Curated annotation (Swiss-Prot):
InterPro entries: ATP_synth_F1_esu_mt (IPR006721), ATP_synth_F1_esu_sf_mt (IPR036742). CDD domains: F1-ATPase_epsilon (cd12153). Keywords: ATP synthesis, CF(1), Hydrogen ion transport, Ion transport, Membrane, Mitochondrion, Mitochondrion inner membrane, Transport. It comes from Caenorhabditis elegans. Pfam families: ATP-synt_Eps. It comes from the Eukaryota. GO terms for biological process: proton motive force-driven mitochondrial ATP synthesis. SUPFAM superfamilies: Epsilon subunit of mitochondrial F1F0-ATP synthase. It is found in: Mitochondrion; Mitochondrion inner membrane. PANTHER family: ATP SYNTHASE EPSILON CHAIN, MITOCHONDRIAL, ATP SYNTHASE SUBUNIT EPSILON, MITOCHONDRIAL. GO terms for molecular function: proton-transporting ATP synthase activity, rotational mechanism. This is Putative ATP synthase subunit epsilon, mitochondrial.
């Protein structure tokens, strides 16, 4: 018999608890520095680069 069934849980409740634990383990704290997104664009005119922004 599987452990969650022996503990008196049904599969739905077991999966809810498991999902909650995974979310708690993977959640970053408020003080975790998040990487910044960068976007680079290049303007082209007649097949030649006109300007490049970073």
């Amino acid at each position: 018999m599987v452990a969650w069934r022996a503990a008196g849980l049904n599969y739905v409740r077991y999966s809810q608890i498991a999902a909650q634990v995974v979310r708690q383990c993977t959640k970053g704290g408020a003080n975790v520095k998040k990487p910044q997104a960068t976007l680079k664009t290049t303007a082209w005119e007649n097949g030649k680069m006109v300007s490049k922004s970073q």
